[in-house]
Amino acid sequence: DRSGENNDSKGMNLLSAARAANNQGDHEGRETYLRKAVETDPSLSRAAIVLSAELALRRRDPAAALTALDSIKLNGYAAELKLQALKMSDDWRASMAALPGLRKLFDTESFENEIALIGLRAEAGNDAELNALFKSLGAGARNSREVLSQYVKSLSYKAHAEPLLRAAIKKSWDSDYVSLYGDADFDTLKARCKAAEGWLKLHEEDPALHYCLGCLYELSNEPNMARESFTRSVELGGSLKGHEKLGLLLAHNGEFESSAQHLKLALSLD
């Protein structure tokens, strides 16, 4: 049918005109051409919406791109456009809300990790939001070393993360996780002490474990045991945190010269 072919051709020409108008900064013209293209050939409705999103991204207007894409069912290409728009929008809440739909179409783990870290930092101290956010993540993100570590750091009530950290350490020994395990709450303090003391059998030479134990003993009001653990941690080449903790303990005990040495080391290692 020649009239149908003419409509096809005219519709495509109008889409091309919309692209040209966008490139020239003629926003009113762009919208007019997009509307006329669909009026001329209704089968171009989806193509016009996708083009509208592409053009919005080109002019760095992620909100317009997301509005357009939210009106259609996503396929792989449209989902990639939505991902670009979300990255450009810098709105972690909108990104989190979009993740379940995007996961169905391609691997979102890298993006999910990025967004999770932003959200977990933004909600630091707001445990209800942190727990909900962490629970909503896919398994890959929840098992990410960076994501789990940030979740633990952001929590004000550390008991929420104790089983997760202990399970992660049991699965694969990780000195950073072990150090975090020492950042305790009173409710899980005994359980943490028992677990950490049990790890000594296999990991007696890990400075992070002695740092962890030092923190736990300090919270348990066992300053002598804390001092021994922090001392062992720094002897094994532990991090600046061990020197800082030991320095503060020594100062509290009136041993200011030794304290100053460790605090100076903590600063020099930073």
List the predicted regions and their residue ranges.
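"A position-specific structural signal for the A-helix of alpha-solenoid helical repeats
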Residues: M12, S16, L51, L81-Q84, ...
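Alpha-helical adaptor scaffolds
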Residues: R19-N22, R35, I49-E54, A116-L120, ...
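TPR/TPR-like (Sel1-like) alpha-helical repeat modules
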Residues: D70-Y77, K87-T108, E162-S175, F230, ...
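TPR-repeat structural position
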Residues: H27-E28, P62, W92-R93, N126-D127, ...
